[in-house]
Amino acid sequence: MPSLHQAEEKWRDDPLGGIEANGTLGGEGCAVAAAAMVFKFYGIDTDPQQLNWFLTAADGYTENGWLYWDRAAWFAPDRVRHVYEDLPSYQLIDSNLSHGNPVIVRVRLRSGITHFVVIAGKDGFDYLIADPGAGAARGLYPLRELGSDIEALRFYEPIANANSQVTANR
């Protein structure tokens, strides 16, 4: 799983959706960074800054600065599709992981703030996460260390044969 830190110096001060009142990638950009990590995992060349720029132009944020998850997939519509955005389900998480698809989950940090991380694997009963926030430098670590239940899921799937046309032309 590619590691992208939402507070990377290059983009941490960029406003979400180009609107300063929405906050910055560094402070509130965990959703954008998590989506960028999944897209990068699927071979799509992006980072939180590029995805934020795209979403800003594509009206990809609500008036409160929340990400329209389906519009993020418009970044590479021939490569990835938005599949699910709803309540948590361990069956859906496990099914996605068994098919090689990471899952974005919303958790609530001990401070009460919601945060998005990417479940990239499983070790026994522990889900292993890539955290675009403060835990970014840790690599994969157990979700349970955040001390939160999973509140919601978002996931994307790669579009099958995304490169078949390129291969056929060679």
Give the role of each language-model region.
Residues M1-G60:
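Active-site-adjacent structural segments surrounding the nucleophilic cysteine of cysteine proteases
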Residues A36-N169:
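Conserved active-site-adjacent core of cysteine acyl-enzyme catalytic domains
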